[in-house]
């Protein structure tokens, strides 16, 4: 029996590539066995030497992505709906929250491509589907990182300069436009193959930029995009939130020292003792989301560096699918972090969806909060 016949008997469908040799035990093919010959050129050679995973792994990931798609679509859809239609939430600062939700929503739009490929066990939608998948992922991933940095910048101004907030709608819109423009080159360059290209990875069901081709241009692209899309936003996030934490600690220390001089237990009201201020709660939500961004994208960044500069044998199809899934998971979790931590969003959600049984107390009036803040600052200054 010839090789093609052996492969047909070992697979559940027709083998389009006879050169996808049968493995030693005779019951598994190499990846790409069901890819048309005219599509093979788009797949890095590294993956064509890896064994095809069991069909159950494809189906399990497909079901997992169905869950991610539903949760992300509903969660981010609600954030976009409420933040864009509620007057109470229509503030310059929340323009960044809305922008992040848009990026996360876009991220989930590529899930149907992955799901279709998974249930067809490979590169079913071909190079066209791959380019769409990777372009969406690049825009949404890089955009989410830079938006998280912008949120950190805004939170720093709100908390350290509460009486001199200089964020306006115009400035917020300009910053969001800059973020979108910042993402564009990292999508257009590989999409047009001017610099690098988008290729399938892992089980050939997802796509990203090429980090496996062994040449200088690929290594330069990987190093450049790693710096500008991951290192830069991460450093900005760390700086902004370290400044916020430092300011909060120094402010609390000053209040305690002043209270001690005045022989009182605390300068804060009973309301402030029982709960954090709205600004701090929002900052906590932002810190959580930035932490999720770092945790979810770090494995992917490390994987791409290994592919470009390290030992490629470490990159098995199964190992590369783990970071590919974790970086999608954050887009699903983000909206629920805000649902838990953002007080005004919770109030609006409670009003529009009472069946969710959210119990969020109305915050103090802005005037009262402003008066309290002013008194604290005056007392601290007097010290």
Curated annotation (Swiss-Prot):
It comes from the Eukaryota. The keyword Disulfide bond applies. Disulfide bonds join 130-207. Residues 361-383 are annotated as: Disordered. Phosphorylated on some or all of the serine and threonine residues present in the C-terminal region. Keywords: Chromophore, Disulfide bond, G-protein coupled receptor, Glycoprotein, Membrane, Phosphoprotein, Photoreceptor protein, Receptor, Retinal protein, Sensory transduction, Transducer, Transmembrane, Transmembrane helix, Vision. Residues 1-57, 118-133, 197-220, 309-316 are extracellular. GO terms for biological process: phototransduction; visual perception. Gene3D superfamilies: Rhodopsin 7-helix transmembrane proteins. It is found in: Membrane. The modification N6-(retinylidene)lysine is found at residue 328. Its main location: membrane. Each Drosophila eye is composed of 800 facets or ommatidia. Each ommatidium contains 8 photoreceptor cells (R1-R8), the R1 to R6 cells are outer cells, while R7 and R8 are inner cells. Belongs to the G-protein coupled receptor 1 family. Opsin subfamily. This is Opsin Rh4.
């Amino acid at each position: 029996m010839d090789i093609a016949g052996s492969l047909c008997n070992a697979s559940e469908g027709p083998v389009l590539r006879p050169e996808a040799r049968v493995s030693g035990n005779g019951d598994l093919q190499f990846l790409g066995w069901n890819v048309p010959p005219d599509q093979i050129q788009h797949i890095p050679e590294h993956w064509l030497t890896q064994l095809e995973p069991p069909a159950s792994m494809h189906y399990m990931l497909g079901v997992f992505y169905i869950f991610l798609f539903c949760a992300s679509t509903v969660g981010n859809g609600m954030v976009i709906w409420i933040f864009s239609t509620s007057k109470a939430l229509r503030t310059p600062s929340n323009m960044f929250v809305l922008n992040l939700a848009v990026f996360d929503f876009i991220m989930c739009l590529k899930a149907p491509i992955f799901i279709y490929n998974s249930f067809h066990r490979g590169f079913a939608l071909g190079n066209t589907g791959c380019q769409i998948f990777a372009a969406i992922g690049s825009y949404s991933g890089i955009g989410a990182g830079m938006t998280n940095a912008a949120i950190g910048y805004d939170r720093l101004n709100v908390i350290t300069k509460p009486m001199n907030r200089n964020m306006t709608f115009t400035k917020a819109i300009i910053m969001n436009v800059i973020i979108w423009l910042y993402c564009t080159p990292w999508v257009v360059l590989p999409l047009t193959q001017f610099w690098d290209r988008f290729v399938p990875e892992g089980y050939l069901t997802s796509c990203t930029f090429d980090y496996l081709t062994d040449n200088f241009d690929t290594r330069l692209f990987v190093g450049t995009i790693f710096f500008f899309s991951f290192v830069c936003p991460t450093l900005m996030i760390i700086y902004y939130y370290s400044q916020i934490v430092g300011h909060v600690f120094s402010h609390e220390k000053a209040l305690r020292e002043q209270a001690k001089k005045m022989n009182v237990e605390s300068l804060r009201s009973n309301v402030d003792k029982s709960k954090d201020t709205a600004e701090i709660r929002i900052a906590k939500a932002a810190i959580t989301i930035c932490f999720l961004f770092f945790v979810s994208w770090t494995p992917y960044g490390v994987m791409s560096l290994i592919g470009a500069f390290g030992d490629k044998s470490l990159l098995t199809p199964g190992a590369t699918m783990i970071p590919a899934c974790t970086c999608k998971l954050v887009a699903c979790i983000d909206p629920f972090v805000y649902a838990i931590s953002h007080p005004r969003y919770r109030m609006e959600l409670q009003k529009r969806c009472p069946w969710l049984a959210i119990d969020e107390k109305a915050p103090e009036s802005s005037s009262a909060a402003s008066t309290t803040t002013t008194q604290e600052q005056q007392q601290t200054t007097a010290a």
